């Protein structure tokens, strides 16, 4: 029998962190992060990284892993996450995978082997330059749509990073991302993943998101971005993240402070909507009510696990 691994996904601001920490305390678990921004060092406020205090002594893996100047592929994530899961199981503890990055979650749940594709940096630069011109991103979006319509259904027309990624993969391999995923799903899945998703009524979730953004600003998000720019003048991938790119636009006088804050809220709400759509496609997923008592959701998780 394959070892069981708990996976908790959900949109941003749905309460994944607090639920997972309470669960870990109850069942002697450790947490494997499934978040493409919390892997970066020095990007704490904007990525809603749990603080030492919030972690309550529970060990977290794949957090503060790389510098914002480094690229971190899905292939690398899968490898590191499986190593962490194995390490947790060896200790006789329960692994709990937690986060909102659908691509990371899928790589584990479906055993998708994303080969570490050697990308053409020059071509990426070319695409970045086009994306930064008026209507350039729109043109790239249309081009990517012709290459891989299925993958583009899940990608927003403003998501520069992922649009460019679709084009890069095709240029490097001659195959689109969807074809590659189909081929790579033939692998045996290592563990018995029990997947739970947190659901919250849209208006309440959006209210939480707006509030969270205000708190991030109060906590010093603008200062965090200033420090990042000073410390890492070249960190294009990390800077495409929601909450960071808008503050950069504000610091470059492209937006007022109020406009930047409003844009972060709007982009985060859109992202949450895409996350929910993504998680709905996961087979055998068990939905939890995010407004329920934490202990009640823990009870539901444990019933499925036993």
Stretch-by-stretch model annotation:
Residues 1-306:
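Phosphate/pyrophosphate-binding catalytic cores of soluble transferases and nucleic-acid-acting enzymes
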């Amino acid at each position: 029998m394959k070892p069981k691994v708990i996976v908790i996904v959900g949109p941003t601001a749905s309460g994944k962190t607090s639920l997972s920490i309470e669960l870990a305390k109850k069942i002697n678990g450790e947490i494997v992060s499934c978040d493409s921004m919390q892997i970066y060092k020095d990007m704490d406020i904007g990525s809603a990284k749990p603080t030492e205090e919030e972690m309550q002594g529970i060990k977290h893996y794949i957090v503060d892993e790389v510098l914002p100047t480094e690229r971190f592929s899905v292939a690398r994530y899968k490898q590191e996450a499986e190593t962490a899961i194995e390490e947790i199981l060896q200790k006789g503890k329960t692994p709990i995978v937690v986060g909102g990055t659908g691509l990371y979650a899928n790589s584990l749940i479906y055993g998708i082997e994303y080969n570490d594709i050697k990308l053409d940096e020059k071509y990426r630069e070319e695409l970045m330059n086009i994306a930064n011109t008026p209507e350039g991103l729109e043109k790239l979006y249309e081009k990517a749509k012709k290459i891989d319509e299925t993958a583009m259904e899940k990608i927003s027309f403003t998501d520069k990073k992922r649009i460019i990624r679709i084009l890069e993969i095709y240029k490097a391999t001659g195959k689109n991302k969807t074809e590659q995923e189909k081929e790579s799903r033939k692998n045996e899945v290592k563990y018995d993943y029990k997947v739970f998703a947190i659901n919250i009524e849209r208006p309440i979730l959006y209210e939480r998101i707006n509030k969270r953004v205000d708190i991030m600003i109060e906590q010093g998000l603008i200062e965090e971005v200033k420090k990042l720019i000073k410390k890492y003048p070249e960190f294009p991938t990390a800077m495409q993240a929601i909450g960071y790119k808008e503050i950069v636009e504000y610091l470059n006088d492209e937006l007022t402070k109020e406009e930047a804050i409003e844009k972060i809220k709007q982009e985060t709400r859109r992202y949450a909507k895409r996350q929910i759509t993504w998680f709905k496609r996961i087979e055998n997923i068990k939905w939890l009510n995010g407004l329920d008592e934490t202990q009640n959701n823990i009870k539901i998780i444990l019933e499925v696990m036993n």
